[in-house]
Amino acid sequence: MECPEGQLPISSENDSTPTVSTSEVTSQQEPQILVDRGSETTYESSADIAGDEGTQIPADEDTQTDADSSAQAAAQAPENFQEGKDMSESQDEVPDEVENQFILRLPLEHACTVRNLARSQSVKMKDKLKIDLLPDGRHAVVEVEDVPLAAKLVDLPCVIESLRTLDKKTFYKTADISQMLVCTADGDIHLSPEEPAASTDPNIVRKKERGREEKCVWKHGITPPLKNVRKKRFRKTQKKVPDVKEMEKSSFTEYIESPDVENEVKRLLRSDAEAVSTRWEVIAEDGTKEIESQGSIPGFLISSGMSSHKQGHTSSEYDMLREMFSDSRSNNDDDEDEDDEDEDEDEDEDEDEDKEEEEEDCSEEYLERQLQAEFIESGQYRANEGTSSIVMEIQKQIEKKEKKLHKIQNKAQRQKDLIMKVENLTLKNHFQSVLEQLELQEKQKNEKLISLQEQLQRFLKK
């Protein structure tokens, strides 16, 4: 395996395990990572070393002598000059290959050592930093000044562009980095990972390969803002239901994120618009039937060639209805279980509220009977020993009545707002009937509240 040319960069001081990349190159030296047949990787300096003024110095005298002799031979044979030029141009036209690079992340103390080696431009760097890749291609042994470190090649959740510069003004892109070699000081670094026993079952082989790939997946980026970026940004894809019957049995909200739902809704609305008469129902989340209507609806008596404006209006009306009756589902895939728990809690709260209302009604009836008996015993509403306790009970009941009255008024206000927004006549009639019931309840609560206040005033006067 051959790794690209590049010098290890200076990593951030704030990172506990600073990142040392092989993708950046300074203007002084270009170290290269080479792998021999024994899978041992060493760093070797390139033949040409760029100086401060941009001049190139040959690696040795033999190379310079060969270049001079070739130039003299070309001068003595001018008839072969054009042919040699054409051959050199054809060789120069070979497209540049994209380099394969990865990021080297080391512990803090070893990262400082490698950084100093890179800055010193020492020729002995190849003896002080070695990378030995294991046959599986995912594990390696990194030696920093004869200190072995266990390393693992992981896949990054994002692609990082590698740039190279010679004058620190102009940058050239050399590669896209998507892997990182993470080194740790602890771990078994001498033994290669054990190969599992070969199996003929393709399913078992596929599962094992998937398990190996998941172990080599890095869930974080290389900067602090990209912590857990794979979990936050890459959501699980929605599974497509193959059976249509199962899809009909399931609720609409379970597949609200499916891409085919929007097209299905448009098709249903289009078929309703083209129909002469329609029958439709509005069902709440708890499964109870709210509205049932049959017959022709003036708002939906549109010809088959209706305009896109009408279609958009119908779909927007459907979205409004869905928003009113079934609140939009949360988009966080990681909190699906929490959403189910919230729904169960809401149902439990509704049941608790119903029970509380029943208990309050029973307590109110009991209090009224007790007050009537007290009035009969006292004759002309004279106070006795139990008068103070009855006054306290009356005050509690008045507070409860006021709270319930406030809730009913809020519900009535919401119904009025819905009536103002909805354009469908049938829905308006339904909301109007609900509003009338709420107004009737409000009137009854007001009467009971006034009665309790009068009784309280009588007890306080006595």
From Swiss-Prot:
It holds the Pfam family TAFII55_N. It comes from Homo sapiens. PANTHER family: TRANSCRIPTION INITIATION FACTOR TFIID 55 KD SUBUNIT-RELATED, TRANSCRIPTION INITIATION FACTOR TFIID SUBUNIT 7-LIKE. The lineage of its organism: Eukaryota, Metazoa, Chordata, Craniata, Vertebrata. This is Transcription initiation factor TFIID subunit 7-like. Testis-specific. It comes from the Eukaryota. Residues 342-462 form a coiled coil. The gene is TAF7L. Keywords: Coiled coil, Cytoplasm, Developmental protein, Differentiation, Nucleus, Spermatogenesis, Transcription, Transcription regulation. The keyword Nucleus applies.
